[in-house]
Amino acid sequence: MINVLLVDDHELVRAGIRRILEDIKGIKVVGEASCGEDAVKWCRANAVDVVLMDMSMPGIGGLEATRKIARSTADVKIIMLTVHTENPLPAKVMQAGAAGYLSKGAAPQEVVSAIRSVYSGQRYIASDIAQQMALSQIEPEKTESPFASLSERELQIMLMITKGQKVNEISEQLNLSPKTVNSYRYRMFSKLNIHGDVELTHLAIRHGLCNAETLSSQ
């Protein structure tokens, strides 16, 4: 039996995935979490084989949760299931320790196939995302996102900023000082040749890394 943990801040999304998996032989949803922090705690305290992880959630988010789970419970396989499929996120997520990467638009059978594949020790990346990653290696000048220059920590903080989170919130959730968070912010601004959080969010929207409605919280 493959024990699966569902991690998404939208209850309807979790309910939909649970419904898909509940009739699949050999797969059992054993728990749910609505944020990255709870997912990390759940994996440390319970027996779970595969985590279906959302990227954008309150708190530390899916990228940092993936990194923490991969470091502390290496036998747990993580599949990022997200609307964010543009470079450089897939590569960054896989580098953080994920075993799979799927779009939330994936067919139910592909989700099942991904769970079984990563449980057996393989990696699973949706074909369209894998093609995009391959093209970025072959023709980087045509496909590379400006965000590819960011470190994993900078990318994580960028995603939190685009969700409208403030420096004090980010510093508390990541156990960093506000000064350190601001250092990352200014480094990002320099790399991306921008001058503030709103401009950062506009750039992220243009490259498919966040949704336009996030601007309302800026």
Curated annotation (Swiss-Prot):
<feature type="DNA-binding region" description="H-T-H motif">
    <location>
        <begin position="167"/>
        <end position="186"/>
    </location>
</feature>
<dbReference type="GO" id="GO:0005737">
    <property type="term" value="C:cytoplasm"/>
</dbReference>
<dbReference type="GO" id="GO:0003677">
    <property type="term" value="F:DNA binding"/>
</dbReference>
<dbReference type="GO" id="GO:0006355">
    <property type="term" value="P:regulation of DNA-templated transcription"/>
</dbReference>
<keyword id="KW-0804">Transcription</keyword>
<feature type="domain" description="HTH luxR-type">
    <location>
        <begin position="143"/>
        <end position="208"/>
    </location>
</feature>
<keyword id="KW-0238">DNA-binding</keyword>
<keyword id="KW-0805">Transcription regulation</keyword>
<dbReference type="InterPro" id="IPR016032">
    <property type="entry name" value="Sig_transdc_resp-reg_C-effctor"/>
</dbReference>
<dbReference type="InterPro" id="IPR000792">
    <property type="entry name" value="Tscrpt_reg_LuxR_C"/>
</dbReference>
<protein>
    <recommendedName>
        <fullName>Response regulator UvrY</fullName>
    </recommendedName>
</protein>
<keyword id="KW-0963">Cytoplasm</keyword>
<dbReference type="InterPro" id="IPR011006">
    <property type="entry name" value="CheY-like_superfamily"/>
</dbReference>
<dbReference type="Pfam" id="PF00072">
    <property type="entry name" value="Response_reg"/>
</dbReference>
<keyword id="KW-0597">Phosphoprotein</keyword>
<feature type="modified residue" description="4-aspartylphosphate">
    <location>
        <position position="54"/>
    </location>
</feature>
<feature type="domain" description="Response regulatory">
    <location>
        <begin position="3"/>
        <end position="119"/>
    </location>
</feature>
<comment type="function">
    <text>Member of the two-component regulatory system UvrY/BarA involved in the regulation of carbon metabolism via the CsrA/CsrB regulatory system. UvrY activates the transcription of the untranslated csrB RNA and of barA, in an autoregulatory loop. Mediates the effects of CsrA on csrB RNA by BarA-dependent and BarA-independent mechanisms.</text>
</comment>
<dbReference type="GO" id="GO:0000160">
    <property type="term" value="P:phosphorelay signal transduction system"/>
</dbReference>
<keyword id="KW-0902">Two-component regulatory system</keyword>
<dbReference type="InterPro" id="IPR001789">
    <property type="entry name" value="Sig_transdc_resp-reg_receiver"/>
</dbReference>
<dbReference type="Pfam" id="PF00196">
    <property type="entry name" value="GerE"/>
</dbReference>
<dbReference type="InterPro" id="IPR039420">
    <property type="entry name" value="WalR-like"/>
</dbReference>
